[in-house]
């Protein structure tokens, strides 16, 4: 299993370095796809470039989904079998990365997803929005197998993820995370869930 860390980035100069360097510290190659961020982000991103950290620049903001699609294609072109998607805002508990990797080693054909465990700092609007999305996911899968469709901390088997992107219409913005997970599920790519805390403070 050859895994690429993919970080879609849009205007997170205060957190992107910590996220990228932490993930590289697990011995993984890291790709940051910058989605048309402000000029102030460029020096931060340029300073991160090394043997194990690459940056691709999208000149115009196209949305999180568009950035992830760009990263998936890069992964294919460079011989990776899996892609570990991580948000750039620093809210994920990155110390759980080995758990996701171990689960993927045991289930290489599954999509391994972070299952957010929220603390008291989670905005109420975010929690209510999650419940609505969870209900929508149940309607589309006729199951409770999609425990959280919005968490951006997940590990895809590359081949089926690219097939979905190329053969179906998947949103280019925040809708991407939920849509690709459901479409993978319809194709028989089942999720494996790893509980992980989410921090907002």
What are the language-model segments listed below?
Residues 4-7, 31, 57:
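Short hydrophobic beta-strand elements that form part
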Residues 2-4, 179:
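Cell-envelope/extracellular polymer assembly enzymes that use nucleotide-activated donors
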Residues 14-18, 39-48:
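Acidic helix N-cap motif at the loop->helix transition within catalytic regions
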Residues 9-25:
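Short, well-formed alpha-helical segments that are part of the catalytic scaffolds
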Residues 169-172, 181-197:
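Catalytic donor-sugar/metal-binding loop of nucleotide-sugar-dependent glycosyltransferases
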Residues 60-62, 66-77, 82, 94-174, ...:
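Acceptor/aglycone-binding surface of glycosyltransferases and processive sugar-polymer synthases
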Residues 34-43, 90:
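A conserved acidic beta->alpha catalytic loop
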């Amino acid at each position: 299993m050859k895994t690429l860390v993919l970080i879609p980035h849009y205007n997170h100069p205060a957190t992107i370095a910590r996220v990228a360097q932490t993930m590289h510290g697990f011995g993984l190659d890291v790709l940051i796809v910058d989605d048309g961020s402000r000029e102030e982000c460029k020096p931060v991103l340029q300073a991160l470039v090394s043997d194990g950290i690459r940056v691709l620049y999208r000149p115009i903001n196209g949305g999180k989904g568009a950035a992830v699609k760009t990263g998936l294609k890069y992964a294919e072109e460079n011989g990776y079998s899996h892609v570990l998607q991580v948000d750039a805002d620093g809210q994920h508990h990155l110390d759980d990365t080995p758990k996701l990797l171990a689960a993927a080693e045991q289930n290489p054909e599954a999509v391994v997803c972070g299952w957010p465990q929220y603390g008291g700092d989670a905005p109420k609007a975010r929690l209510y929005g999650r419940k609505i999305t969870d209900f929508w996911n149940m309607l589309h899968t006729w199951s409770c197998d999609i425990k959280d469709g919005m968490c951006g901390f997940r590990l895809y088997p590359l081949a089926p993820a690219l097939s979905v992107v190329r053969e179906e219409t998947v949103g280019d913005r925040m809708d991407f995370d939920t849509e690709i997970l459901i479409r993978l599920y319809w194709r028989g790519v089942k999720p494996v869930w790893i509980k992980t805390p989410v921090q907002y403070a």
